[in-house]
């Protein structure tokens, strides 16, 4: 039965939940909004599969990189619409053109971050750009295994703990599986992200606030609308801020008195917000 001596060591990858043959594991948010596994002990058969797939308990081997490359997409539009150099788009396009499936993080209709699949170029675009929030993996490991057994080429992108969780879950090396680790130093919880968006979209009507955070200016432009008013979220806006500064932008349907439809424009994200 899955149990870590330090609860906070859990990365929330969901490998244990998806591998459990009795479906007796479920995830629940704690007071900080992070997802942690709980076990229905009355249904557990102590098979130990949940512990075998856990990337915290079974960290695997440390592999040394064979080669290191610096890469960027040649298409400027794709680079501007990406968080960095647009490499994910090229990898995803290659896999889809081969009849494969791409898995990555996307926003759902409530702007929460979830892993989902893309089998066409239209469905690939929502997976572009980094989302600096813990994603809900859902049942994607099971889906990946199904596609791999069908012989399809699969690309799975995620944080290092999610990738290791997937590989432990599969328990088999597949030549038709490509994985891309996103370098991660920790992310805010889904609960904190949800609360942030709710507070952001319920500020005083058309109020413009300018505050100083560690010497950096943050502009808030908002009206009292629900999260459904949001039309786009970009953690790395480049057309307005360029490549040197980090610009976090939330777009909404209505327009403020200043003529901007941006809820939040900020350049403080190159600093430690805490």
Tell me what each language-model feature is.
Residues 2-6, 15-32, 36-38, 48-65:
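Iron-sulfur cluster-binding cysteine motifs and their immediate structural context
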Residues 5, 14-16, 26-28, 33, ...:
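Generic structural signal for short, flexible, solvent-exposed coil/loop and linker residues
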Residues 42-43:
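Short, charged amphipathic alpha-helical surface segments
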Residues 61-274:
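Iron-sulfur-associated redox domains of electron-transfer enzymes in respiratory
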